[in-house]
UniProtKB/Swiss-Prot annotation:
Belongs to the peptidase M20B family. The keyword DNA-binding does not apply. Its EC number is 3.4.11.4. Zn(2+) 1 binds at residues 82, 142, 199. Binds 2 Zn(2+) ions per subunit. This is Peptidase T. The gene is pepT. Zn(2+) 2 binds at residues 142, 177, 381. Its main location: cytoplasm. It comes from Streptococcus agalactiae serotype III (strain NEM316). Cleaves the N-terminal amino acid of tripeptides.
Length: 406
């Protein structure tokens, strides 16, 4: 089904810079997310008929309720998307609207080309309306497509009271892209039986498995002396960092893994001879493998310290989130409903693990099972990001189908 305001809504949202900041200690981490919630989303939620629309300064969530139109026994369902965008330029986003007929797409005057040679997924979108970047920023479909889809679905339901449904809760949260958005999620305030994050990618994605995730921060303490007299005296902290990295499995990196394979990812390395620091993320799906990965990292550090006869490798290892499959597989109702709705809409459900995490990972372990629905974005987190309007429309269809089906 086509929805009159969906595209307009989406374009309005993405033009607002809501990039999160991993170095901030505020909640949300950027004021722009607060402003987006209070000056754009909150008035719109109230205007389309949501009730008890309120912003929670304690966690940065904007929450609203669509009252039930039926007194039949059914589940209270929630829909959640995040307001922040990823770590890429989000200032002066200028979307392009392209009626795609195949071939390359010039991204404004940036000199960058969105080409099916580099991104074969473009070939799935012949004849569709694509929204792309101008090559200078990301787009922000992750996850403003999800926000636009939820908002459009709620507007449709509010204007069609003949559609019977139970109470629906909507939540728009901060800081998902830096992994802390759901840390302070208020389960009592949201109060649903189960929920969906609308934060997935291509048409049909339906996900209830995520990585289990840990962060690993290492500090290497060296000893700097003049290199001309360094023999048996210098301890090069940068070399220690390299030695640590070389002892991790060479083929267990993001660029060499897929499917259910886990990895170690070195994403930051800096330092001098005197001191160096490296930062990793550790990811795996199975609990036993996740534990093995963490133990290996600790063992390497311990063995290096033993060989050096002092604690020159300092380890900070901490869990970030866990595979939500452990919670959701206890009651597959939200998956079964979404799968059935997609099939009725001639959408093939793509039930695959998320090689990442969503806010739903943490929310599920807080007591609200929260799988993930497709929102349409492709090539997310960079200048080659795009989304299909037709996929966004089908995401709205699925949301409407879920609340009517239950």
């Amino acid at each position: 089904m086509s929805y009159e305001k969906l595209l307009e809504r989406f374009l309005t949202y993405v033009k607002i810079n809501t990039r999160s900041n991993p170095n901030s200690t505020q909640t949300p981490t950027t004021q722009s997310q607060v402003d987006f919630a209070l000056t754009v989303l909150k008035p719109e939620m109230e205007a389309i008929g949501l009730k008890d629309v309120h912003y929670l300064p304690s966690n940065g969530y904007l929450v609203g309720t669509l009252p039930a139109t039926s007194d039949r026994l059914c589940h209270k369902i929630g829909f959640i998307s995040h307001m922040d965008t990823a770590d890429f330029n989000a200032e002066n986003i200028t979307p392009q609207i392209v009626d795609y007929k195949g071939g390359d797409i010039e991204l404004g005057d940036s000199g960058y080309i969105l080409s099916p040679k580099d991104f074969p997924n473009l070939n799935n979108y012949h004849g569709q309306t694509l929204i792309t970047t101008d090559g200078k920023t990301l787009l922000g479909a992750d996850d403003k497509s999800g926000i636009a889809e939820i908002m459009t679905a709620m507007e449709y339901l509010a204007s069609h009271p003949e559609i019977e449904h139970c109470e629906i809760r909507v939540g728009f949260g901060p800081d998902e892209e830096i992994g802390i958005g759901a840390d302070k999620f208020d389960v009592k305030d949201f109060d649903v039986d189960f929920a969906y994050t609308v934060d997935g990618g291509p048409l049909g994605e339906l996900q209830y498995e995520t990585f289990s995730a840990a962060g690993l921060e290492l500090t290497f303490e060296g000893r700097n002396v003049h290199p001309g007299t360094a023999k048996n005296q210098m301890i090069n902290a940068l070399q220690l960092a390299m030695d640590f990295h070389s002892q991790l499995p060479e083929n267990e990196r993001p660029e060499q893994t897929d499917g259910y394979q886990g990895f170690y990812h070195l994403y930051d390395l800096s330092g001098t001879v005197d001191q160096a620091k490296s930062s990793y993320i550790i990811r795996d799906f199975e609990e036993v493998n996740f534990l093995k990965r963490k133990h290996l990292a600790q063992d390497i550090a311990d063995n290096m310290n033993e060989a050096l006869q002092s604690e020159r490798v300092k380890v900070k290892l901490y869990d970030q989130y866990y595979n939500m499959k452990k919670v959701i597989e206890k009651d597959m109702t939200p998956i079964n409903i979404a799968k059935e709705v997609m099939e009725e809409l001639d959408i093939k459900p793509i039930i695959e693990p998320i090689r990442g995490g969503t806010d739903g990972s943490k929310i599920s372990f807080m007591g609200i099972p929260t799988p993930n629905l497709f929102a349409g974005g492709e090539n997310m987190h960079g200048r080659f990001e795009f989304v299909s309007l037709q996929t966004m429309e089908k995401a709205v269809d699925v949301i409407l189908g879920i609340v009517a089906k239950d």
